[in-house]
Amino acid sequence: MELSQKEIGLDRSKDDNGLSSNDYVVLGIHYPIDSDDDKVVELANKRSNSAGGSIGMFQQFFNKVEEFDYHPGFLSDVISRIHFTYRTKFIPIARSDDGPSPLRINFLIGDNPFNAIENAIYNPNCFNTDIGWGCMIRTGQSLLANAIQIAILGREFRVNDGDVNEQERKIISWFMDTPDEPFSLHNFVKKGCELSSKKPGEWFGPAATSRSIQSLVEQFPDCGIDRCIVSVSSADIFKDEINDIFKNKRYSNILLLMGVKLGVDKVNEYYLKDIRKILESRYSVGISGGRPSSSLYFFGYQDDTLLYFDPHKPQPSTIESLLETCHTDNFDKINISDMDPSMLIGVLLQGEDDWQSWSNEVFDSKIINILNSRNDVTIAEDSMSLEETLEPPDNEYVDLGPMSQQLNGSP
């Protein structure tokens, strides 16, 4: 049996924009598959024939071939994204009297047993790791760090092994796990307690994460982001609020954080194309979400496969480890249909021109809604108050997408 390029994922068909449907996309930048198609097809057919013509066997082979054939520009871009993970042995965070215990088994099993025993003996009432509860905070940190990196260094910035960028080192140090750093886990937890009633050791959702980011950004103007606008229950963005910011400073850097739930148990097919469009936008800084109580940081896609960094790998909480591990080419993939419907979408607007361009870009979005003002939001056939709709708990998102489309006159 002879296999075609289409069967093995090398079909160079074009989408509506004239771009290859097989391109890899990283935060708005397209990269072609960098491989010798004829050679890959030849090798694939040899493997397929020897396996009795199994396309499934071939696809496993192609996945391995593909690992060695990424476009160099794609790999450079991926490696330059910032990625944070679980950390161990950081400065202890005291537990709340009515909060989770640091000695819960699901926290302990993921840690080095010696670390777990040491903490149980010397700090039984403190957390010195975020294993089992901090993944949404870590992916929120990743989203924020990449937004800051772009705001300060530009989207074209790339990591160079032979040339350490001191400004980027400073950005990364802001996320070190110590109360003294502005975007540390400690300060996320502190804001989670103040703004979202989250106790140390409790899992954050998109709403708590976005509120913490907004408050921490406001307290640290040196981060390069002038304002952080949060929509915790939908992706509603209000023109009057954004326009007021640009009236005062035309070239403001605005980070938009939009919490959405695009289905019940899984993402509704109605939204799948728009998720790709969000990651394809040059204004995207990624999506935090993934699976129930298991957050991932999505930074790109290829076809129906999303590309992500997984924070669930514990590493020591030292500045040396942080600097060594925050850049990696070790990314994973998931089919878009397997994505959890609750997610936090990040968009960075660098000036009024970006705002106008992005507004036009999402005009027909099924997820993001640009409304004139909050007065345009009506809760038809719903007993919830406006305040409840705009500020739901993490597990009670309201999908206002179709309703807002009706307000905008969209089909």
UniProtKB/Swiss-Prot annotation:
Coiled coil: none
Keywords, sorted A to Z: Autophagy, Cytoplasm, Hydrolase, Nucleus, Protease, Protein transport, Thiol protease, Transport
Protein's UniProt name: Probable cysteine protease ATG4
GO terms for MF: cysteine-type endopeptidase activity; protein-phosphatidylethanolamide deconjugating activity
Pfam families in the cross-refs: Peptidase_C54 (PF03416)
GO biological process: aggrephagy; autophagosome assembly; cytoplasm to vacuole targeting by the Cvt pathway; mitophagy; piecemeal microautophagy of the nucleus; protein processing; protein targeting to membrane
Top class in the EC scheme: hydrolase
UniProt-annotated stretches for the region Disordered: 390-411
EC annotation from Swiss-Prot or TrEMBL: 3.4.22.-
Localization annotation: Cytoplasm; Nucleus; Preautophagosomal structure
Function (record text): Cysteine protease that plays a key role in cytoplasm to vacuole transport (Cvt) and autophagy by mediating both proteolytic activation and delipidation of ATG8. Required for selective autophagic degradation of the nucleus (nucleophagy) as well as for mitophagy which contributes to regulate mitochondrial quantity and quality by eliminating the mitochondria to a basal level to fulfill cellular energy requirements and preventing excess ROS production. The protease activity is required for proteolytic activation of ATG8: cleaves the C-terminal amino acid of ATG8 to reveal a C-terminal glycine.
Family: Belongs to the peptidase C54 family.
Any one of the GO CC terms: cytosol
InterPro entries (alphabetical): Papain-like_cys_pep_sf, Peptidase_C54, Peptidase_C54_cat
Catalytic activity: [protein]-C-terminal L-amino acid-glycyl-phosphatidylethanolamide + H2O = [protein]-C-terminal L-amino acid-glycine + a 1,2-diacyl-sn-glycero-3-phosphoethanolamine
Annotated catalytic residues: C135 (nucleophile), D310, H312
